[in-house]
Amino acid sequence: MARVKRGVIARARHKKVLKAAKGYYGARSRVYRVAFQAVIKAGQYAYRDRRQRKRQFRQLWIARINAAARQNSLSYSKFINGLKKASVEIDRKILADIAVFDKVAFTALVEKAKSVL
């Protein structure tokens, strides 16, 4: 068997990792070993946070809806229950948007929810 030297492959792999670590602080962007660990960890954080982002936005929407509903003297849970009973199928993202940018429409939704309760 002929001897296989891995110079080209190793250099390509190192370049790929160092390119991914571009902008990292200190050795994390210059030393392959450290950069490799940093890139792996960054991937783990990115994977985790893509899932957390969905939860955090839902929390934000609920907080906004709750604040707007309480200004109309109704709690969040009663408001959502009223909307379900009134068969209003608007998701929390849109409700939060309405609560922030169109207070008149949100008040109308609250009145509709109150009338069913």
From Swiss-Prot:
It comes from the Bacteria. One of its GO terms (cellular component) is ribonucleoprotein complex. Keywords: Ribonucleoprotein, Ribosomal protein, RNA-binding, rRNA-binding. Gene3D superfamilies: 6.10.160.10, Ribosomal protein L20. One of its GO terms (biological process) is ribosomal large subunit assembly. InterPro entries: Ribosomal_bL20, RIBOSOMAL_L20_CS, Ribosomal_protein_bL20_C. GO terms for molecular function: rRNA binding; structural constituent of ribosome. Signal peptide: none annotated. Belongs to the bacterial ribosomal protein bL20 family. Binds directly to 23S ribosomal RNA and is necessary for the in vitro assembly process of the 50S ribosomal subunit. It is not involved in the protein synthesizing functions of that subunit. PANTHER family: 39S RIBOSOMAL PROTEIN L20. This is Large ribosomal subunit protein bL20. It comes from Actinobacillus succinogenes (strain ATCC 55618 / DSM 22257 / CCUG 43843 / 130Z). The lineage of its organism: Bacteria, Pseudomonadati, Pseudomonadota, Gammaproteobacteria, Pasteurellales.
